């Protein structure tokens, strides 16, 4: 199109345009009233209110982030600039069974927003309490109405969160202590069906061993969705199937049999119609090489002509790097000895120090930390073969000090710091020490004999003032690309907005 003058709000010129599966082309794109009105070479710019020269830049449809935890962030920053700046124009919220569809759900004794989010997302309870105080709705319809009133940046699609659905139907305590009655299960099915008709895009559930409550006396319990038996999940997903909606789920990580049984619910052959299912996550876990292969095998099996499923695991297109503050980290939750520290409130330094100083706890921690690292046995063999049970590999060389009161340790990996501590205590470090480092070693680290002693003392000395990072999955970018480009997997699991420090 050349020569023709047309009214254009925005003309983007000379961009490399990617659209669907088409070969990328260099062209102009004209936009009026928020809609593309023409594409082509050398569009006349005389009628354009704004012209952008995009030479050397890419122009593409907005990205769709299918796995976010922006539920609370939307209430504070509804524009979601951290996503829109990357070109994301649509997000899905209320993943992994947690969301705000039913409001604050307080019952006078328990505060579900605080209980469910504090440890899962590492958010201080005071912040969560303030968020819950400002919630004015109590039904799925009212929540959608509320979202419509926000100045949203991207489009927002909402799942109905199963943990909150259980709380709404069974009460908080009932949702984590018993199965639903027949009438309660029917009530959940009815509420889910009604929500899907309102515009909720599906149901989210969760079975990962990282998601625990922050509500006494139930800090040893996982979030409500994980107490659902198979028959409950089957009944609810049947409602999702009937309405052509989506089930977002996570697998029972430690049981291949339970995983296969659960995800056979996607089968059209067994259930008359495929259930659209998206699952977290197809990751190349550093501590267990089998899991990424299992994800691909599962995808091929469940989508095969034999099973006739509609099953897509989400693949993350980046390294899975986790930041932690002292012992406060999501990956600690599946290890009982580390979980005890996570059960304390974020602000409770004294509580964590008391645990870390208890002789029985010290014994248990050291046994956990050194498991598989010494003496031959099944644990040592599994570590050698890289098929361990936990996502966190407890390898000092893989853990990097990001922030620390002892400033010269920042940027070092924990193994280097440990070696330095031993060199100082054995008086064989060939460099001059600062007074502060020497005093720290003398007062806190002089009795360190092994790496378990060292880890315990790092947590005692610095608590949450010690920030560190580790890459738990997707270290090999070649494997990441293979997963991302697999036609049976979906780009996703960004976990945007999840885990405050991530």
Predicted region positions:
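Histidine-rich, glycine-flanked metal-binding segment
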Residues: 2-10, 17-62
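Divalent metal-coordination and catalytic microenvironments
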Residues: 15, 34, 56, 67, ...
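Short, glycine-/Ser/Thr-/acidic-enriched flexible segments
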Residues: 18, 23, 36, 43-44, ...
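Divalent-metal coordination cores built from histidine and acidic residues
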Residues: 76-190, 194-202
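Short low-complexity, flexible loop/linker segments enriched in glycine and/or proline
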Residues: 105-116, 217-222, 226, 262-266, ...
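Glycine-rich tight-turn/loop motif centered on a GG-T
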Residues: 115-132, 136, 174-182, 215-229, ...
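Active-site neighborhoods of metal-dependent hydrolases
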Residues: 143-147, 153-155, 159-169, 176-182, ...
């Amino acid at each position: 199109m050349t020569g023709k003058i047309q009214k254009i709000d925005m003309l983007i010129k000379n961009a490399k345009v990617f659209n669907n599966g088409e070969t990328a082309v260099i062209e102009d794109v004209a936009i009026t009233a928020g809609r593309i009105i023409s594409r082509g070479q050398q569009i006349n710019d005389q009628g354009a209110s704004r012209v952008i020269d995009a030479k050397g830049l890419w122009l593409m449809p907005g990205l769709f982030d299918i796995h976010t935890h922006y539920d609370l962030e939307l209430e504070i920053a509804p524009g979601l600039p951290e996503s829109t700046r990357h070109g994301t124009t649509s997000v899905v919220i209320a993943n992994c069974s947690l969301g705000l569809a039913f409001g604050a759900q307080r019952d006078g004794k328990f505060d579900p927003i605080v209980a469910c989010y504090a440890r899962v997302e590492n958010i201080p309870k005071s912040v969560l309490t303030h968020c819950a105080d400002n919630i004015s709705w109590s039904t799925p319809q009212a929540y959608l109405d509320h979202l419509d009133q926000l100045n949203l940046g991207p489009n927002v699609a909402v799942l109905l969160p199963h943990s909150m659905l259980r709380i709404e139907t069974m009460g908080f305590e009932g949702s984590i202590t018993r199965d639903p009655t027949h009438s309660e299960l029917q009530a959940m099915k009815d509420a889910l069906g009604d929500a899907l008709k309102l515009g909720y895009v599906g149901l989210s559930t969760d079975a990962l061993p990282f998601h625990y409550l922050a509500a006494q006396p139930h800090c040893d319990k996982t979030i409500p969705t994980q107490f659902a038996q198979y028959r409950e999940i089957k009944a609810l997903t049947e409602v999702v199937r009937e309405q052509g909606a989506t089930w977002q789920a996570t697998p029972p990580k430690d049981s291949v049999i339970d995983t296969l049984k659960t995800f056979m619910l996607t089968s059209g052959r067994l259930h008359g119609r495929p259930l659209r299912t998206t699952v977290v996550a197809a990751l190349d876990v550093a501590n267990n090489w089998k899991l990424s292969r299992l994800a691909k095998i599962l995808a091929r099996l469940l989508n095969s002509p034999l099973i006739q499923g509609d099953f897509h695991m989400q693949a993350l297109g980046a390294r899975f790097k986790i930041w932690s503050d002292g012992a406060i980290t999501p990956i600690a939750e599946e290890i009982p000895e580390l979980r005890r520290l996570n059960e304390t409130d974020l602000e409770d330094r004294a509580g964590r120090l008391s645990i870390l100083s208890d002789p029985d706890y010290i014994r248990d921690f050291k046994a956990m930390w050194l498991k598989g690292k010494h003496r031959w046995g099944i644990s040592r063999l599994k570590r050698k073969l890289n098929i361990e049970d936990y996502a966190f590999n407890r390898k000092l060389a893989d853990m990097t000090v990001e922030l620390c009161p002892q400033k010269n340790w920042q940027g070092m990996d924990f193994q280097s710091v440990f070696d330095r501590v031993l060199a100082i205590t054995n008086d064989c470090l060939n460099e001059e020490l600062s007074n502060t480092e020497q005093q720290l070693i003398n007062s806190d680290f002089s009795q360190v004999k092994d790496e378990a002693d060292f880890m315990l003392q790092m947590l005692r000395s610095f608590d949450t003032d010690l920030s560190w990072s580790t890459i738990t999955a997707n270290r090999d970018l070649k494997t990441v690309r293979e997963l991302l480009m697999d036609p049976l997997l979906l780009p996703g699991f960004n976990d945007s907005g999840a885990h405050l420090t991530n």
